[in-house]
Amino acid sequence: MKKRIYIVLVVVMMLELAGCGKDSGLDVEEAKQIQVDEEISTDLVYESRMELEYATEYAVDYYSDGYDLITISDGSRFLIVPEDKEVPEDLDEDIKAVQQPIDNIYLVASAAMDMFRSIEALDKVKFTGTDQDGWYLPQISQLMEQGDIIYAGKYNAPDYELILSEGCDFVIENMMINHTPEVKEKLGNFGIPVMIDRASYEEHPLGRCEWVKLYGVLTGREEQAKTAFDEQAAELERVLTDEEQNKTQQAPAVAFFYLTSNGAVNVRKTSDYVPKMIELAGGKYIFDNLGDAQNKSSSVTMQMEEFYASAKDADCLIYNSTIEGQITSIDELVAKNQLLADFKAVQSGNVWCTTQNMYQESMSIGSMIADMHAAFMTDASQKDDTRYLFQLN
């Protein structure tokens, strides 16, 4: 009988900074059980588990001779088999063997593309589920223009003929695939392993970013992945250090929103990662308990009157441009709804807009937190060098 060990991964959302002990600002504790299977095959000897700082939705276990086992929190498992090694004959039936090199990935989870870019593994991506016009990352648009990355259809309507003819060897879906399980099943019937990226379910914003380590394992670029993640973790550390040095400053109240085409206001649920980024950046999200935490949707739509009551006295407004497009001035914002002219942040000029690549640059979450922190600071000199936010005049 095979022996399995259950390790409880308790992730306390706290970052201990050298010399100051400043916590992350998030009172979130998430416990998960991800099974460690020491005996997936008589040919492989279990060695260790990858250390993760924030991510809890996956695990990577190392075995002898360079074999790696990726386990996703939904229960799916993938054995990454080195190029010069054989697939063990007695491998557990639920484990999908994936032989390296993996060179023709169909990447439907668009937020993961920046992770491949950050570890110089775009040569491993052959197909995307986002057409060229939908990309705000110039490098991806250029690769599609050159034909190096091909649009192969959305998550619910992949071009099976194209995928098969071009030799797709791995599919990375986003959570939307759960709405069309028949697509996942059909891809599996063709013998193509399908993994679902669950980064959007991570409790801590940097947990999303830490999925780059999984893709480092998949592509043989673990060192590059660690470096890319550490850069973002260092950005957060700098912000928390600055907050510790300025802890007497009151946290500004912050609203993050956009106006829909029919005049309603879309805001993030309190449990979403953006409000958590605002907290880490030193702000206070205006909604203390908005939305059902059990419902995994990220946002809530409300009428302007309700938003007005909660956000009128907010110290800072951040307009989310990723859905309805960018705005360039406070006048343009107020033109969308005259009630915004009454807002404290509008009258003081503390209104910001996100760049449209904010969502797609998933490997810049630490940098985005740093930008938010700069926007919240009273020192005007710290507001000039932001990349993902710009102040409206």
Language-model regions, residue ranges each:
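Sec-dependent signal peptide recognition
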Residues: 3-10
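C-terminal motif of bacterial Sec signal peptides marking the signal peptidase cleavage site
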Residues: 15-19
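Bacterial Sec-exported substrate-binding components of ABC uptake systems
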Residues: 20-113, 224-256, 380-393
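Structured C-terminal subdomain patch of bacterial secreted/periplasmic proteins
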Residues: 25-28, 202-231, 241, 316-393
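A short, structured surface patch at a secondary-structure boundary
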Residues: 68-74, 78-164, 170-176
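Extracytoplasmic ligand-binding site segments that recognize negatively charged/polar headgroups
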Residues: 103, 110-119, 128-139, 179-182, ...
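Structural recognition of the beta-strand scaffold that forms the well-ordered cores
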Residues: 104-107, 124-129, 170-174, 194-197, ...
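Flexible, glycine-rich surface segments
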Residues: 239-328
